[in-house]
Amino acid sequence: MATGPRYKVPFRRRREGRTNYHLRLKLLLSRQDRVVVRKSSRNVQIQLIAPTPDGDITYSSAVSNELAKYGYTGATGNTTAAYLTGLLFGLKSLQKGYEGGILDIGLQASSAGSRVYAALKGVVDSGFEIPCSPEVFPPDERIRGEHIAGYREESSDLPEQFEATKEKIFAEFS
């Protein structure tokens, strides 16, 4: 299939839609640790990754499934869970001695107010240093889950549950 001088096959991970090599090169040349945020419909995953010649090393990570340990019973794929996961990740990383990094959202669309930026706000609120503009963060009402509590009866206590979970996370790492 890839024969002849006029045809170039992209790298496998580019073909699969998993890696933007131009962005990855810029991030690697910065020589800073990357705070990688990945989301699915059910979870949000955040990792602190450092590049090395032998391959990337993961220093710290948090997944929204871990919020159940802190009493959070809501959905783990929403904006509220993304913020709490970012907060948990930031406090874990600070406890391990890491102080900052740069955001890596990969091939995800960069939309102000999205779950990616809710997770970033959680990381920044924990005290972890990431250069960013506060204009991209979602409103506090969305982070607390008031928009969900307004239309879903099962989640009517989500803002209170958010505050309780946030206090438990801070209590564990203080």
From Swiss-Prot:
Pfam families the record matches: Ribosomal_L5e
GO cellular component terms given for this protein: cytosolic large ribosomal subunit
Cross-referenced InterPro entries: Rbsml_uL18_euk
Family, similarity comment: Belongs to the universal ribosomal protein uL18 family.
Complex formation: Part of the 50S ribosomal subunit. Contacts the 5S and 23S rRNAs.
BP-aspect Gene Ontology terms: ribosomal large subunit assembly; translation
Protein name: Large ribosomal subunit protein uL18
PANTHER family registered for this protein in UniProt: LARGE RIBOSOMAL SUBUNIT PROTEIN UL18, RIBOSOMAL PROTEIN L5-RELATED
CDD domains reported for this sequence: Ribosomal_L18_L5e
The entry's keywords: Ribonucleoprotein, Ribosomal protein, RNA-binding, rRNA-binding
Top-level taxon of origin: Archaea
Species name: Methanosarcina acetivorans (strain ATCC 35395 / DSM 2834 / JCM 12185 / C2A)
